[in-house]
Structure formats: structure tokens, C-alpha cells
Curated annotation (Swiss-Prot):
One of its GO terms (molecular function) is structural constituent of ribosome. InterPro entries: Ribosomal_bL20 (IPR005813), RIBOSOMAL_L20_CS (IPR049946), Ribosomal_protein_bL20_C (IPR035566). Keywords: Ribonucleoprotein, Ribosomal protein, RNA-binding, rRNA-binding. This is Large ribosomal subunit protein bL20. Belongs to the bacterial ribosomal protein bL20 family. One of its GO terms (biological process) is ribosomal large subunit assembly. Coiled coil: none annotated. The keyword Cytoplasm does not apply. Binds directly to 23S ribosomal RNA and is necessary for the in vitro assembly process of the 50S ribosomal subunit. It is not involved in the protein synthesizing functions of that subunit. One of its GO terms (cellular component) is ribosome. HAMAP family: Ribosomal_bL20.
Amino acid sequence: MTRAKSGKISKKRHKKILKLAKGYRGRANSCFRVAIEKVEKALLYAYRDRRNRKRDFRGLWIQRINAAVREHGLIYSQFMGALKKAGINIDRKVLAELAVNNNDGFTSIVQQSKAYI
């Protein structure tokens, strides 16, 4: 029985990794052994940072809402508590967007929530 060498398969696997390593510095873009380590690490970073991005954006929205609410003499925690009591169900992403781009709409929401403080 002849020996089965996995030439096609390993070449395909190498090409796939080297394609992902395109643009890396030094031997990391041409040497398979180095490239596979760099690609694995890059994919781990990408996975981790997709989760961190959600965390970072939530923090950004809270900062924007807090800054806009302080112009009306409130603080963020009071405002969010008043919104909950008022039954206004708007998420932080939309509130931050209103605070930045539609100041009149945000002001009306703040006025409605002030009654519940």
C-alpha cells in the first residue's frame, strides 16, 4: 500500500494561515511556524475585543448622557431612576444619540422625568 502524503491538504492549510497573516511584520507574514502563532494570538485578541467593544460603548453612552443631564441640573443616576419611575423605556444608546444630535428631544425627556425625582 502506498503512503498517503497530505500535500494538497497541508498546502491549503498553510495558504489559509498565511493569507490571514498578510501584512504582518518580519517572518510572521511568510514563515508558517511564526505566522500560525501570530494569527492565533490575533484571533484571540479579536474575540476578546469584540466583547470589550460592547463594554466601551456602554461607558461612552453613559458619559454622554451624564454630561447632557448635568446641563439640566441632574446627575446620571437620578435621571435614570426618574426615567424608570416615569415608565420611559429608552435605552442608553438612543438617549446618548438624542443628547448629541437632538437636544430639544432630550430636553423634553429630561423635563418629563424631573417630575418623578
